[in-house]
Amino acid sequence: MEGQRTQRRGYLKDKATVSNLVEEEMENGMDGEEEDGGDEDKRKKVMERVRGPSTDRVPSRLCQVDRCTVNLTEAKQYYRRHRVCEVHAKASAATVAGVRQRFCQQCSRFHELPEFDEAKRSCRRRLAGHNERRRKISGDSFGEGSGRRGFSGQLIQTQERNRVDRKLPMTNSSFKRPQIR
């Protein structure tokens, strides 16, 4: 979470820097260039000077796998965002930048093949985190807010209570044993 905040601050700082540069360039009159077209044209020229040509910002509409020519303009948003076609997102291996890799479903990016267990679709790192969260055992994990529902959850709750009951000594002074005569 802290990393996201830091990244966001950095992004906002960069964005503010670009805004300041644009305003500064506009105030200076583009360093003696002639004004032909108004504020909007001027702003575009300044933005191009600050950020670089707009062609650098246009994302590729093709799958990033080597020699794949699938056009992603009609693909689902997920595939466009990650620049991978549906076939290569589910493939056991693909060549990206000359290296054999597999698309990780958890990270939504390509990893080298040794980072996966056998035919798994998630890298070891993300899979380990997922399994850790699944197996986490704490007092809160069996409460109402847990993801466990139904009979098996009730059975686990009962087993946990029995374990606790067996460990508690019977030293309560208000407890009276029934006497059989």
Swiss-Prot record:
A motif (Bipartite nuclear localization signal) lies at residues 120-136. Transmembrane segments: none annotated. Induction: Negatively regulated by microRNAs miR156. Residues 1-58, 128-181 are annotated as: Disordered. Binds 2 Zn(2+) ions per subunit. Residues 22-39 have a biased composition (Acidic residues). Its cofactor is Zn(2+). This is Squamosa promoter-binding-like protein 5. The lineage of its organism: Eukaryota, Viridiplantae, Streptophyta, Embryophyta, Tracheophyta.
